Amino acid sequence: MLPFTLQQLRILKAVATEKNFTKAAELLYLSQPSLSKQIKTLEKNLDILLVNRENNKISLTENGKIFLQYSERILALCEESCRALIDLKNGERGSLTVGASQTIGTYLMPRVLALFAQNYPQIDLKVQVNSTRIVAKNILNREIDIAVVGGEIPLDLKKNLTVEKFVEDEFSLIIPKSHPFANKKIVTKEDLYHLNFISLNSNSTIRKFIDNILIQNQIDTKQLKIIMQLNSIEAIKTAVSLGQGAAFVSSAAIEKEIELKTIEILKIENIRITRTLSIISNSESYKSKAFEFFSNELKKLKNEIEN
């Protein structure tokens, strides 16, 4: 007989999240005394202290943190097994959680999500947009079923993921319509030193990626004039449209601006800044029919983009 129940694992997870017995009890629709009793019973059965209760502050012990990791995996597997059975019973019904890194989730993913929702309205679709690392981690935790990411996948996570090449994402150099370079179409590396740049902050993975490509092409990024650092692609595009400077932006993010003709795009002589977008999933998790349907929609989008 196991020394714990699924309900006790849910309780431990809620306590870890809320860091408060009363709030955790409310989350699970339990009384606070009942929740406290379940935690004590779990600790007694495991013969390990899981929760610190010092100075009215609730936190997990180191043993509690380790046990929580396994608890979350057990709960995720239980939920996955139920989904598999429902899948067999209901055919094209079910649920799917899709993940995406920031730029993809904002500009590329909505197209496929809209088509998927239209074609499979009976499937409950949820979306998580976050950094590539967090999305990959949530794939492994079975909180996300499938995702499209653009950043480099950390090696410690990548080994347990199925990674499939999706499409190439090119970064365009955009400038205001009023800029003297607007009629050039192609600029040299030397021309870059005469531009005022608007960029993401230096800790951004996209900023680091672009800088690395420029450095590989013998461009001294420290000599580029960065007049403004903003924390969103939308803010950067707006600033460029208003004539405040130039920027490197994913081509997927500027379709509207191209259509409205609010910016100009410049090519850099003999340089292309591209990255590979990847479709990732958990190598060991159950692949539902909803998963298969969504994978097919991604393949359709890939063919549309490449052709």
From Swiss-Prot:
Stretches assigned to the HTH lysR-type domain: 4-61
GO molecular function: DNA-binding transcription factor activity; transcription cis-regulatory region binding
Keyword Protein transport: no
Pfam families according to UniProt: HTH_1, LysR_substrate
Localisation per UniProt entry: Plastid, Chloroplast
InterPro entries the record matches: LysR_subst-bd (IPR005119), Tscrpt_reg_HTH_LysR (IPR000847), WH-like_DNA-bd_sf (IPR036388), WH_DNA-bd_sf (IPR036390)
Keyword flag Membrane: no
Gene Ontology CC: chloroplast
DNA-binding residues: 21-40
Domain of life of the native organism: Eukaryota
Keywords in alphabetical order: Chloroplast, DNA-binding, Plastid, Transcription, Transcription regulation
Function, as annotated: Trans-acting transcriptional regulator of RuBisCO genes (rbcL and rbcS) expression.
The family this protein is said to belong to: Belongs to the LysR transcriptional regulatory family.
Protein name: Probable RuBisCO transcriptional regulator
Source organism of the structure: Phaeodactylum tricornutum (strain CCAP 1055/1)
Phylogenetic classification of the source organism: Eukaryota, Sar, Stramenopiles, Ochrophyta, Bacillariophyta
Gene: rbcR
